[in-house]
């Protein structure tokens, strides 16, 4: 074993240097944690142009977990193993040391299932589908995640690791083309000459592996596998959550990660060796926990393989590392630290700036290649400007190979500490500018957020604009004049049915999920009710506009602040801002500097960084240069959140000379009186408080910014007081699941809206399970969290149930400590318990729902919710948002009484929360919650009864339309009619084209929202790209939509065709006399005017040209 010394920060540079010098040699760089492995992998592509550098990720689950790892991680591991075994060139692998203990499939496994496709190769859809299933791909209706594929007609869509999505078009028995497509838009982006497909999992289920599993399972665990869903799933060829923990049972033998390379040299340090020993100890602990849990329950279907069966031993791996060719590295930083440290150690009394000293260092090392590394684009631009000010030239680089001598090289390079070698001097901007150095998030921004709300399920209540509340039963096809046509079947009172043609689907709006009385078809009651509501909406709209106008009339002095000091404040933020955060911050900055009062809503999912955005606003106002003693008030709904915000603000604003206080029930009355006096005199710059801040005895000296966190938690009287402040102060409201009232205000343009939909770096979705109360699973969940160094929440909605839960926890997890918090305790006692939980002084916090708002403890990542069916949807979502807020996977267990039969609405709530696991689900949750509980009021004086009259969607549409009319905007008012088009053509989306009925309804809904011909054509292009060439019936539908748009412009209520021409009936109130007379005059031989606003146009028609003829007729009418 060789030993070498170099700076710790140069670890990747050193590994690349060795790799480059030994062209025929494989290397493994082993590090002591997963985060460092990923960081070094990203650095490697700057230090080397060699493409044969790989990263093997760790699972995001713990040993003996009964949930499966993230599919992206599973597929990335499989992809890496495939490349290692199929690439004959020398390779460098970077990985977490613990992965060296993993038992993996035999090394020839991935080469057996390696598949290369290219255009014109002979392959049928069925053949490829079978191979994909064998390669662990899952067949779904649509492809959205890594490892999924879908079949639609002559097209297969497949998602590979990356993720990268490909569309394979077939023509009979060969592949016609392969295209890459965008997962979010489903639109293809470029053609590919070949496509390499390998297994997306380390386990494939075929006759051989399933046979091995059966035999090995029998040998290890005996025959007692009756009613075991894991065993039954696997022998049936289906995946099962957590079956990865039984991997060795599927193969005759296993290989190690080292076996996948050709006699590699391992580069490691003593920390890596220590990590291997600690991982083995953890595995042993988890094994004991799982074994003990299994003993408590007969036929537990997660049998535990011994650590020796599941992993290689630490002693064997350590012995392998210590072989003669491997390299043990140690670190010497003292000399380098003093050299680089001297740059940034400029004292206050020195005349030289930090950059004067930097350029002295550069001048002394100009014989070397000097590289200044910036972590982000903003610092890169600042460094460029500084270099130019010092009259040096610079060279922008992306790779180390591009670096030149006698010039300063700069680039965006993920390096966090300076170091030097004989040939190079690396200096990081993070040390020069005191900024953070992290890695930008590669997660794509969530697309079409509000479009995801546009679901309509069979059995849901709906509202027809003309006929009122009904129940959507299903899509149904009818034959009309020998042609099939899709209709929405709506049930009304008295078992009456209404059939709405799909091209008129926009007349149908979702009502919600409350049980309601159905309207009667043909009754005048609906029209009377709608007309009355329209008058009330007009009043509300006028009031809303007056509020907005009154605010705009209040001129505000544009906020000015010190940009250099602001940059320093921003640099103290320990994370990279997401794209959406930066956009929201820029929106706020524009609001504060434009001379008008700000009224903005920040909608961002739980844990997506709304608080940091608010803090930027606070800084801009509190440090305003042109205001005398400006003040900021932050109003929060709970004492716990107030205390947390106060602590965070104190830490974040440290060193900026701002006086920050909190006012809530934890503050003594004596201290509260002092705070009130200091607020009135202007001595306090930032006050954070609960509803106490909204009391009439609170006087501000110069309140310039009001921040409202989770506004929906405040009562009506408190909201009225908040409104009185809005006329003189800037207002910023924040919400994770925006209540419809607030969201409606934003969508109607009366309140500015910023959406934060991009998750932070490395954020993982919370795994959510709905299950009967089970002490074994609860014990296992709590112990697993404890063993990975974390803490757990145990939420009990009712205080009276806490004693029982406490007794049960004493029995099932006696080794864990806990404390209780609930609303009947004194605020000071709650504060004391929460402080201890923050500090990690006990393992489990048993609490009521008082923790639902804003609690942020990154070490607490397991939550059990007792009797979850008794909580509302937004409550469940907010509670779940307390976990998984860092880089650690969160686990939420929603328990219900095992013998309890759930009501339909309770069951639906739990289904929604379980299925809404994706990051950024808050908007979907808000919509579902509105469906389940109805909307709140808009301006305080009216509750949700009005909305129940017509349903949420129609109410929103009516409100938007009325506000637009009152604001005199160029938006067409509600059409008093819907054109009915009957051209005797088949109009529907065939099952062979889109087989999933829910997707088909969603597409029909989207079609109903198309507002012009360009949108129709774009939609058509998207359909062709996603599903293949349009069937004639679908094409007819889109053509009829375009004709319908023309009918709107011409006030045509009916357009019918027959063998001898068209019959047009104009809307009764439309004045079309001039156009009709001109048209009749021009085409007197082909036209007839009939009573009831009808126009007959005579022309022999056939199916193939009927669309063309109809278009020609309407365009002629339009242009005449």
Curated annotation (Swiss-Prot):
Sorted UniProt keywords: ATP-binding, Cytoplasm, DNA damage, DNA repair, DNA-binding, Helicase, Hydrolase, Nucleotide-binding
Motif (DEEQ box): 709-712
Enzyme Commission (EC) number: 3.6.4.-
An individual GO BP term: transcription-coupled nucleotide-excision repair, DNA damage recognition
GO molecular function, one term: DNA helicase activity
Domain Helicase ATP-binding: 591-756
SMART domains given in the database record: CarD_TRCF, DEXDc, HELICc, TRCF
Binding-site residues for ATP, renumbered to this chain: 604-611
Pfam family, one: TRCF
Enzyme class of the recorded protein, top EC level: hydrolase
Location of this chain's protein in the cell: Cytoplasm
Cited InterPro entries: CarD-like/TRCF_RID (IPR003711), CarD-like/TRCF_RID_sf (IPR036101), DEAD/DEAH_box_helicase_dom (IPR011545), Helicase_ATP-bd (IPR014001), Helicase_C-like (IPR001650), Mfd (IPR004576), P-loop_NTPase (IPR027417), RecG/Mfd (IPR047112)
Entry GO terms, CC: cytoplasm
All copies of domain Helicase C-terminal, residue ranges: 777-933
HAMAP family for the chain: TRCF (MF_00969)
Similarity comment: family membership: In the N-terminal section; belongs to the UvrB family.
Functional note: Couples transcription and DNA repair by recognizing RNA polymerase (RNAP) stalled at DNA lesions. Mediates ATP-dependent release of RNAP and its truncated transcript from the DNA, and recruitment of nucleotide excision repair machinery to the damaged site.
Protein name as catalogued: Transcription-repair-coupling factor
Lineage start: Bacteria, Pseudomonadati, Pseudomonadota, Alphaproteobacteria, Rickettsiales
């Amino acid at each position: 074993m060789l030993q070498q010394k170099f700076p710790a920060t140069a670890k990747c540079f050193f590994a690349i240097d060795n790799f480059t010098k030994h062209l025929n040699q494989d290397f493994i760089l082993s590090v002591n944690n997963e985060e460092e492995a990923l960081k070094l992998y990203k650095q490697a592509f700057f230090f080397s142009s060699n493409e044969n550098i790989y990263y093997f990720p760790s699972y995001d689950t713990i040993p003996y977990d009964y949930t499966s790892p993230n599919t992206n991680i599973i597929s990335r591991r499989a992809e890496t193993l495939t490349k290692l075994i199929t690439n004959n060139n020398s390779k460098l692998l970077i990985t977490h040391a613990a992965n060296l203990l993993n038992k993996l499939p035999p090394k020839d496994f991935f080469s057996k299932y390696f598949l290369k496709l290219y255009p014109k190769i002979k392959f049928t859809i069925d053949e490829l589908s079978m191979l994909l299933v064998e390669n662990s791909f899952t067949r779904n209706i649509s492809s959205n995640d890594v490892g999924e594929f879908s079949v639609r007609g002559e097209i297969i869509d497949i998602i590979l690791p990356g993720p990268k999505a490909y569309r394979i078009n077939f023509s009979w028995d060969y592949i016609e083309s392969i295209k890459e497509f965008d997962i979010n838009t489903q639109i293809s982006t470029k053609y590919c000459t070949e496509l390499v497909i390998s297994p997306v999992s380390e386990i494939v289920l075929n006759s051989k592996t399933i046979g091995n599993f059966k035999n090995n399972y029998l040998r290890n665990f005996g025959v007692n596998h009756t009613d075991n869903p894991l065993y039954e799933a696997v022998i049936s060829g289906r995946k099962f959550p957590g079956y990865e923990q039984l991997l060795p049972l599927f193969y005759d033998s296993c290989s190690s990660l080292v076996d996948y390379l050709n006699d590699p040299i391992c580069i490691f340090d003593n920390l890596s060796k220590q990590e291997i020993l600690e991982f083995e100890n953890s595995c042993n602990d988890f094994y004991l926990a799982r074994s003990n849990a299994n003993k408590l329950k007969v036929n537990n279907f997660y049998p535990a393989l011994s650590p020796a069966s599941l992993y290689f031993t630490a002693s064997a791996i350590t012995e392998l590392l210590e072989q003669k060719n491997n390299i043990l590295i140690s670190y010497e930083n003292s000399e380098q630290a003093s050299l680089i440290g001297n740059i940034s150690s400029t004292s206050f009394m020195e005349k030289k700036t930090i950059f004067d000293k930097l350029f002295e260092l550069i001048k002394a090392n100009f014989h070397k290649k000097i590289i200044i590394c910036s972590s982000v684009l903003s610092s890169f631009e600042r460094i460029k400007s500084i270099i130019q000010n010092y009259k040096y030239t610079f060279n922008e680089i992306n790779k180390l190979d591009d670096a030149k001598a006698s010039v300063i090289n700069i680039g965006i390079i993920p390096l966090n500490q300076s170091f030097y070698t004989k040939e190079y001097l690396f200096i990081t901007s993070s040390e020069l500018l005191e900024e953070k150095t992290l890695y930008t998030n590669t997660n794509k921004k969530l697309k079409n957020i509000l479009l995801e709300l546009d679901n309509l399920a069979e059995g849901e209540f709906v509202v027809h604009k003309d006929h009122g509340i009904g129940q959507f039963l299903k899509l149904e096809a009818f034959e009309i004049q020998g042609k099939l046509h899709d209709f929405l079947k709506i049930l009304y009172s008295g078992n009456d049915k209404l059939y709405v043609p799909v091209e008129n689907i926009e007349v149908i709006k979702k009502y919600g999920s409350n049980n309601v009385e159905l309207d009667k078809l043909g009754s005048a009651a609906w029209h009377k009710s709608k007309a009355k509501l329209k008058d009330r909406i007009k009043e509300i709209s006028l009031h809303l506009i007056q509020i907005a106008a009154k605010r705009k009339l209040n001129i505000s002095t544009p906020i000015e602040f010190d940009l250099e000091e602001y940059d320093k404040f921003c640099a103290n933020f320990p994370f990279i801002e997401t794209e959406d955060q930066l956009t929201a911050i820029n929106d706020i900055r524009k609001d504060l500097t434009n001379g008008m009062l700000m009224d903005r809503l920040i909608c961002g999912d739980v844990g997506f960084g709304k608080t940091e955005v608010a803090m930027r606003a606070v800084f801009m106002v509190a440090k305003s240069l042109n205001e005398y003693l400006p003040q900021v008030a932050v109003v929060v709904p709970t004492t716990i959140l107030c205390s947390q915000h106060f602590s965070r603000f104190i830490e974040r604003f440290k060193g900026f000379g701002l006086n920050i206080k909190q006012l809530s029930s934890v503050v003594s009355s004596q201290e509260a009186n002092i705070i009130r006096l200091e607020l009135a005199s202007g001595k306090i710059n930032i006050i954070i408080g609960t509803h106490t801040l909204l009391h009439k005895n609170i006087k501000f000296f110069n309140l310039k910014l009001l921040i409202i966190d989770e506004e929906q938690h405040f009562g009506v009287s408190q909201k009225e007081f908040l409104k009185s402040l809005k006329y003189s102060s800037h207002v910023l409201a924040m919400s994770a699941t925006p209540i419809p009232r607030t969201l409606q205000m934003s969508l109607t343009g009366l309140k500015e809206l910023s959406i934060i939909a991009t998750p932070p770096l490395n954020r993982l979705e919370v795994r959510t399970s709905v299950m009967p109360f089970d002490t074994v699973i609860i014990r296992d969940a709590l112990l697993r969290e404890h063993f990975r160094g974390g803490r757990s929440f145990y939420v009990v909605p009712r205080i009276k149930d806490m004693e029982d839960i406490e007794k049960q926890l004493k029995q099932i997890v006696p080794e864990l400590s806990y404390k209780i918090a609930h609303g009947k305790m004194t605020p000071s006692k709650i504060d004391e318990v929460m402080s201890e939980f923050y500090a990690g002084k006990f393992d489990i916090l048993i609490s009521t729902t008082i923790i639902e708002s804003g609690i942020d403890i990154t070490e607490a990542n397991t939550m059990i919710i007792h009797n979850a069916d008794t909580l509302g949807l937004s409550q469940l979502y907010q509670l779940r948002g307390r976990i998984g807020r860092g880089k650690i996977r969160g686990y939420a267990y929603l328990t219900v009484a095992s013998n309890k039969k759930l009501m339909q609405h309770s069951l639906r709530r739990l289904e929604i929360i379980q299925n809404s696991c994706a990051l950024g689900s808050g908007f979907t949750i808000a919509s579902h919650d509105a469906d389940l509980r109805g909307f709140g009021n808009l301006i305080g004086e009216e509750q949700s009864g009005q909305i129940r009259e017509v349903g949420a969607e129609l109410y929103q549409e009516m409100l938007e339309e009325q506000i637009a009319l009152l604001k005199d905007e160029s938006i067409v008012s509600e059409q008093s009619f819907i054109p009915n088009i009957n051209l005797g053509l088949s109009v529907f989306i065939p099952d062979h084209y889109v087989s999933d009925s829910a997707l088909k309804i969603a597409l029909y809904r989207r079609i109903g929202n198309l507002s012009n011909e360009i949108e129709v054509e774009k939609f058509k292009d998207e359909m062709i790209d996603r599903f293949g060439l349009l069937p004639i019936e679908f094409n007819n539908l889109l053509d009829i939509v375009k004709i319908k748009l023309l009918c709107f412009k011409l006030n045509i209520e009916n357009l019918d065709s027959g063998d001898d021409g068209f019959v047009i009936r104009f809307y009764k109130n439309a004045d079309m006399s001039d156009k009709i007379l001109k048209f009749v005059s021009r085409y007197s031989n082909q036209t007839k005017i009939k009573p009831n606003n009808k126009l007959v146009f005579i022309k022999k028609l056939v199916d193939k040209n009927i669309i063309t003829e109809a278009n020609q007729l309407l365009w002629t009418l339009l242009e005449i």
